[in-house]
From Swiss-Prot:
This is Large ribosomal subunit protein uL13. InterPro entries: Ribosomal_uL13, Ribosomal_uL13_bac-type, Ribosomal_uL13_sf. This protein is one of the early assembly proteins of the 50S ribosomal subunit, although it is not seen to bind rRNA by itself. It is important during the early stages of 50S assembly. It comes from the Bacteria. One of its GO terms (molecular function) is structural constituent of ribosome. GO terms for biological process: negative regulation of translation; translation. The gene is rplM. Part of the 50S ribosomal subunit. It holds the Pfam family Ribosomal_L13.
Length: 150
């Protein structure tokens, strides 16, 4: 008798997804490479049960956001653009000022650009926790240290 092989595609259901917590130390890491690794974990693409239309990702805590590494002349040349939708409401801020004022925002903007820009992407983004210093208040979730390759 021959074996029966199931050719059905597996689709994860929101209730059966198990979520883990990861902590990443951003000190000295290159911004774009770190952001792409974080986006992969948030999306759940590292899991075999990844389903594109279901939130299968894990939580990510990023510490030492103020000590992120950058390549080239990005510290002086990279700018962030925003507009308030009012006439003359353009706000342009360079990376050096943003790292000084709110270093968490730099990593958040980099990761947000790598997530889908829809309802699912907004739900995924809520699972990202970024802190400027080495401390974070999520010790009770017992996060696992995540190694990011340089």
């Amino acid at each position: 008798m021959s074996k029966t092989i199931s050719f059905k595609t597996y689709s994860a259901k929101p209730g059966e997804v198990e979520r883990k917590w990861y902590v990443v130390d951003a000190e000295g890491k290159v911004l774009g490479r770190l952001a792409s690794e974080i986006a992969t974990i948030l999306r759940g693409k590292h899991k075999p049960q990844f389903t594109p239309h279901v939130d299968t990702g894990d939580f990510v805590i990023v510490t030492n956001a103020g000590k992120i590494g950058l390549s080239g002349k990005k510290l002086d040349q990279k700018t962030y653009f925003s507009h308030s939708n009012y006439p003359g409401g353009v706000k342009i801020e360079n990376l050096k000022d943003m790292l000084r004022k709110k270093p968490e925002k730099v990593i958040e903007k980099a990761v947000w650009g790598m997530l889908p820009h829809n309802n699912l992407g907004r739900a995924l983004f809520k699972k990202l926790k970024v802190y400027a210093g080495p401390e974070h208040p999520h010790v009770s979730q017992s996060p696992v240290e995540m190694k990011v390759n340089q």
